[in-house]
Amino acid sequence: QMPKDELILLIQSSFRNYRPKPARREYIEKSNGKKRPLGIPTVLDRIIQECVRIIIEPICEARFYPQSYGFRPYRAQKHAIRGIINVINAGCKSPDQPVWAVEGDIKGCFDNINHRLLLQKLWRIGIHDKRVLKIISQMLKAGYMENDLFHVTELGTPQGGILSPLLSNVYLNDFDWYVGRMYMEPHRQCKHKGNDTRRLKWAGVTPKYNYRYADDWVILTSTEKEALRLKRVLTKYFRNRMKLELSQEKTYVTNLRTNGIHFLGFVVKAERKRKTPDPATWTNHLVGKPLPDMERLGKKIKKLLEEVHRIELCQKVNVQAAQIQYVNSVIMG
């Protein structure tokens, strides 16, 4: 273990003439059987990435969209689901209740991020120190090693790096605000934001509410026509403005009253409230209901049971203890 003072000197000297080393490429299995590439940087590179993250994260957080929940402090999946449910419930007595949704899927989002566009977005969001931008640019172009061969990275942020989640949020932040300005977070003309959204509603603008977690996003609106229009508009927006592609096979327009949306391990539907013993408290309005995605959950339970069964097959005590520790880590997440 390196002494603290010596480590600080090493980091300071590295910042003066920083040259990141190529990351080590590894693959982890996804739930659908495919493999996701991970870039594992060196220990020194990880420390420097964490230093950069500490510097730029507060600046970025001040400009991030309020309904973006992935890889952000004090935000989690449950907050995104709760926001969707609140929006559905708030419009339960309105003819404009958001019961149609666009579920978005970006093809290889993290692997296709344009480096030049990302640096421009960092500048616009408030990162004006050119030394920091230079370090980030070098990190993005450091490349990776696979089977003892060096590969150049022209696109994407390395999944597995400490800074990558923050950079992906910076890249997709313009998309958040592009949709948000349509209705949910309009340009302020009134003293209170509620008056601005009311002004848009009176002008005939169809309500739309967007929620994003990492590269998964959902937009709620009140009509099928508006949902189909948004899908067409956003397909062009991602292609022309973000240099990314929406998967047309996996980008759905969904009626929450019949199918529900699959988002962050839940199936969110708009259904009637369950009848209560007191008829006076029961209404016929639709409310949002988050239900566990049983198909996805069933696969994970089956895999977990297989790992539990392996504990019984372990002959050595230390191997059995390691397997128990692994199973506990999976359960705890």
Which positions does each model-derived feature cover?
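Non-catalytic terminal/accessory segments
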Residues: 1-333
